[in-house]
């Protein structure tokens, strides 16, 4: 049998993968990793780094901010439109609450990018991290498009779906994919990501920290591939990974990503807030 690594970011696929595949891969003595991508592989590596030694984590807020001019695919657009306006279970206020996908965008601040509006998206982290990190208050994930008009268009589609006017916004993926290029002149090749955490450090003192990455020259789409590349290199070098089926959560340290960031000229910052 062979080892298995994927870059999936579908919440149900990634979260259900370990239980569904554990027996088969454990019996074969092989490793299977789902979601070896920006989320939850890189996002968990960042949280592990920011919160090392902390007594507790209260909140985790993640936002990905793609560059308007970066390459984008119609299939990806269809996938995100599929839950636009649908309720997403989010750990918020210490309990599970429904948040509407892509609705009600709110401001997000970045270290090296201009402020953007970000809206809730459905990813594995929302389900994995509350238990994995025992987050007391909330775990959120937002996507922040560079052009505000595009972000508000998604919010409008979410509203239309909630009203029952547009039950299948994913059918507009082809149109929006081609129309999106008309907005490229309003954007830049600069994208990024921020992970914010709050909690109590090793001394029990309140702490708020943030990790930022900025990817210029339309290199942002290289980030989702990095975790899979790093894990594949480990296997090729004979370095053991846990047998059985797993998500990529906390399988890689943040330091492992540093050479990949440098290769593409990406800049990271850790900020005490």
Task: Name what the model sees in each region.
Residues 8-31:
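Rossmann-fold NAD(P)-binding glycine/threonine-rich loop
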Residues 46-51, 129, 227-235:
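Buried hydrophobic packing segments
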Residues 42-46, 122-125, 223-228:
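Catalytic-loop motifs flanking and including active-site residues across diverse enzymes
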Residues 159-273:
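C-terminal active-site/capping subdomain that shapes the small-molecule cofactor and substrate pocket
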Residues 52-199, 205:
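Active-site-lining helix/loop region of Rossmann-like oxidoreductase modules
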Residues 28-67:
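Adenosine-phosphate binding glycine-rich loop
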Residues 3-4, 32, 268:
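Hydrophobic beta-strand scaffold residues
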Residues 2, 9-12, 37:
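Short, ordered loop/turn segments at secondary-structure junctions
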């Amino acid at each position: 049998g062979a080892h298995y690594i994927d870059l999936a970011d579908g919440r149900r696929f990634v979260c259900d993968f370990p239980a569904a595949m554990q027996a088969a891969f454990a019996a074969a003595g092989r490793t299977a990793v789902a979601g070896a991508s920006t989320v939850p592989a890189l996002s968990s590596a960042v949280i592990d780094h920011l919160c090392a030694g902390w007594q507790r984590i209260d909140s985790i807020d993640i936002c990905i901010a793609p560059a308007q001019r970066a390459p984008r695919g119609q299939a990806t657009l269809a996938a995100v439109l599929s839950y636009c306006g649908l309720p997403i279970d989010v750990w918020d206020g210490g309990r599970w609450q429904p948040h509407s996908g892509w609705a009600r965008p709110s401001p997000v601040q970045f270290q090296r990018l201009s402020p953007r509006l970000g809206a809730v998206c459905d990813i594995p982290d929302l389900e994995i991290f509350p238990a994995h990190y025992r987050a007391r208050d909330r775990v959120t994930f937002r996507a922040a498009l560079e052009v505000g008009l595009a972000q508000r268009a998604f919010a409008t589609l979410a509203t239309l779906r909630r009203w029952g006017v547009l039950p299948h916004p994913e059918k507009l993926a082809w149109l929006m994919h081609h129309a999106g290029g008309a907005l490229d002149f309003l954007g830049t090749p600069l994208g990024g990501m921020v992970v914010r955490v709050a909690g109590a450090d090793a001394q029990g003192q309140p702490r708020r920290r943030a990790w930022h990455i900025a990817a210029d020259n339309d290199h942002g789409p290289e980030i989702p591939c990095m975790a899979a590349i790093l894990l594949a290199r480990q296997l090729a070098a004979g370095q053991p990974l846990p047998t059985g089926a797993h998500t990529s959560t906390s399988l890689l340290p943040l330091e492992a990503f540093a050479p990949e960031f440098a290769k593409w000229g990406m800049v990271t910052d850790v900020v005490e807030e």
